[in-house]
Structure formats: C-alpha cells, structure tokens
C-alpha cells in the first residue's frame, strides 16, 4: 500500500490571467504567420484562389504545429482545443491580404 499515490479529485482551477496570456500568444503567432505567409504569397506572385489556398494551408500548418507543441496536456494551457484551430483565423486573413497585396504590387507591378 505504500506505493499507491493518492489523487485529489475535484474541480480543476484555471488561472484567468494565464488563459488570457496564452490567448495573446496564440494571437501573436497567428498574426506573425499571416504576415509572413502574405509576404511570401505576394513575392511568389500568387493570385486569386491560389493565394487564399496558400493562406489556409499556412494556417492549417500553424494549427498543426500548435497542437503538436501543446501535446497531450493541452487542457493544462487552454480551456478547449478550438482556439488552437480557429482562433484568429478571420483576423489573420485581413493581415494576410494586406501583406499579400502590398508585396505583390511592389514586386510584380512596379
């Protein structure tokens, strides 16, 4: 009986400040990847549907990397897995389009 560890059952307490901090880190990652992938799409000269497909592929790759980084203990850092996949997706799209059109214009038009 000496080798039996006692587990404390009950509600799991989550720090709201830590949750907000983790959400801010996710938002920063999404914004950075959106800007970088938008610049890449503009330099590569991607247009119309290919440009949007490139954004969603880059966003999916980031989501996959975030899930791999959080590992099996994702509930230690987030309330649900949904923010890892969809958090900041639309806001990142606006950043992507901004960098995409700017660099496309600078490289291929002027």
UniProtKB/Swiss-Prot annotation:
Transmembrane regions listed in the UniProt entry: 29-44, 51-71, 90-106
Lumenal-side positions: 45-50, 107-110
Gene Ontology CC entries for this record: EMC complex; endoplasmic reticulum membrane; membrane
Keyword Disulfide bond in record: no
Family matches, as Pfam families: EMC6
Annotated membrane topology: Multi-pass membrane protein
Keywords, alphabetical: Endoplasmic reticulum, Membrane, Transmembrane, Transmembrane helix
Sequence ranges on the Cytoplasmic membrane side: 1-28, 72-89
InterPro entries linked to this entry: Emc6, EMC6-like
Keyword Metal-binding tagged: no
Role: Part of the endoplasmic reticulum membrane protein complex (EMC) that enables the energy-independent insertion into endoplasmic reticulum membranes of newly synthesized membrane proteins. Preferentially accommodates proteins with transmembrane domains that are weakly hydrophobic or contain destabilizing features such as charged and aromatic residues. Involved in the cotranslational insertion of multi-pass membrane proteins in which stop-transfer membrane-anchor sequences become ER membrane spanning helices.
Family (UniProt): Belongs to the EMC6 family.
Subunit text: Component of the ER membrane protein complex (EMC).
Protein name in UniProt: ER membrane protein complex subunit 6
């Amino acid at each position: 009986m000496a080798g039996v560890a006692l587990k404390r059952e009950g509600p799991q307490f989550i720090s709201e400040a830590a949750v907000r901090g983790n959400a801010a880190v996710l938002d920063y990652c999404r914004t950075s990847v959106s800007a970088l992938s938008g610049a890449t799409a503009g330099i590569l000269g991607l247009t119309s549907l290919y440009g949007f497909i490139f954004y969603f592929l880059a966003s999916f790759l980031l989501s996959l990397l975030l899930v791999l980084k959080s590992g099996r203990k994702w509930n230690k850092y987030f309330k649900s897995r949904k923010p890892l996949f969809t958090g900041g997706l639309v806001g990142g799209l606006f950043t992507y389009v901004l960098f995409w059109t700017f660099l496309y214009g600078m490289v291929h038009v002027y």
